[in-house]
């Protein structure tokens, strides 16, 4: 009987020892699983709105590099300029990157929106295209010209025509002149305003169109080869108001991830992809001494 009791005690001790070992392994597994969950929770997910396929391609590259920072950046592509700011303002987007400071200032003033730029992306030429003439000076009297119908891009198109010597604008018109600010039109240009996305598609029906680069590229035009006049030959003539930027809601200004997104964009890798997908048209707008907040404040004041 004593032998049986002794054996049973030994057996029970062994069972408890095995159970203890099993619990130890389970604890280690649980700990590893907990760490995996914690690591997953540490990654952040955001959505950025862009316009056009070229911008989407550039941001795809940026997003792939941000994965190493624990940031998942989803890209939502829009086909026009109105929706991305509305979506950012209502919280559907976390950031957007499609507009220059002048366009943003016009939106902020018109909608009392609390949006702000946090870093420059690129400066994109506005180009004049024609299937009728090879030199913009050769436009005939009464030539038909199509420009964007929004205030800022339409204003920039008019400034391009002024730079080309085709029209003169009222000095008091500010950074976003309108057709009513034309003070001289010696060639009697017949200027029509349409949605910016439709401008390059009007080329077959007009003597000249003045288009944003993203829409020109999407329409199969090569700004470097096909444009007969661009406004970025001398960047000093363009000004900070036409630098494009990454934009957020002001309430998110302290989000450190957003600064990481800016830093990932403002890189040599981005510049190379940008050059490839825009056929050399878009140029990096960032520098080591940027004051995007200060420059935007000035543009806001000028736009009022």
Regions found by a protein language model. Give the residues of each.
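An extracytoplasmic/periplasmic, membrane-proximal ligand-sensing/linker region
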Residues: 43-46, 54-58, 68, 206-208, ...
């Amino acid at each position: 009987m004593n032998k049986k009791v002794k054996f049973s005690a030994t057996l029970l001790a062994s069972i408890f020892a095995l159970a203890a070992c099993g619990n130890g392994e389970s604890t280690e597994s649980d700990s590893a699983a907990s760490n995996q969950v914690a690591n997953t929770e540490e990654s952040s997910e955001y959505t950025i709105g862009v316009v056009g396929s070229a911008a989407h391609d550039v941001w795809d590259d940026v997003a792939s590099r941000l994965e190493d920072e624990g940031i998942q950046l989803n890209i939502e592509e829009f086909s026009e300029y109105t929706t991305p700011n509305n979506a950012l303002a209502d919280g559907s987007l976390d950031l957007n990157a499609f507009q220059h400071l002048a366009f943003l200032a016009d939106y902020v003033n018109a909608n009392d929106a609390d949006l702000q730029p946090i870093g420059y992306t690129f400066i994109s030429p506005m180009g004049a295209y024609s299937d009728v003439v090879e030199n913009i000076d050769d436009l005939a009297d009464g030539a038909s010209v199509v420009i964007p119908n929004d205030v800022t891009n339409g204003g920039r198109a008019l400034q391009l025509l002024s730079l080309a010597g085709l029209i003169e604008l009222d000095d008091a018109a500010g950074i976003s002149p309108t057709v009513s600010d034309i003070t001289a039109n010696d060639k009697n240009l017949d200027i029509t305003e349409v949605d910016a996305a439709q401008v390059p598609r009007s080329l077959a029906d007009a003597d000249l169109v003045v288009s944003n680069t993203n829409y020109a590229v999407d329409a199969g035009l090569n700004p470097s080869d096909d444009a007969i006049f661009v406004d970025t030959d001398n960047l000093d003539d363009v000004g900070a108001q036409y630098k494009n930027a990454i934009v957020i809601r002001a309430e998110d200004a302290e989000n450190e991830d957003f600064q990481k997104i800016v830093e990932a964009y403002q890189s040599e890798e981005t510049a190379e992809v940008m050059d490839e997908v825009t056929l050399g048209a878009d140029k990096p707008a960032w520098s080591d001494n940027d004051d995007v907040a200060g420059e935007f404040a000035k543009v806001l004041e000028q736009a009022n």
